[in-house]
């Protein structure tokens, strides 16, 4: 079995989504990661922040951070694919952690 690597995913949720829908969205994307072999260590809202420029017609959004470990890139690829087509996620970024 290959060694587990640490990753951090940051994504921005549109600001006009209600709390119940945002919770469902976060749960859905956490489940996508775990169903594809990743282990979610931490998944939490960072803050609602104003953008330097408009993204998708919005001037602000809620940043959500997920820390996880994965042995392969299946979970990351599926998260990337589905977040690109989801209208509630304005932007996302996946970073490999070195710590």
From Swiss-Prot:
One of its GO terms (molecular function) is small ribosomal subunit rRNA binding. GO terms for biological process: translation. CDD domains: bS6. Keywords: Ribonucleoprotein, Ribosomal protein, RNA-binding, rRNA-binding. GO terms for cellular component: cytoplasm; ribonucleoprotein complex; ribosome. It comes from the Bacteria. The keyword rRNA processing does not apply. Belongs to the bacterial ribosomal protein bS6 family. Binds together with bS18 to 16S ribosomal RNA. This is Small ribosomal subunit protein bS6. It comes from Lactiplantibacillus plantarum (strain ATCC BAA-793 / NCIMB 8826 / WCFS1) (Lactobacillus plantarum). The gene is rpsF.
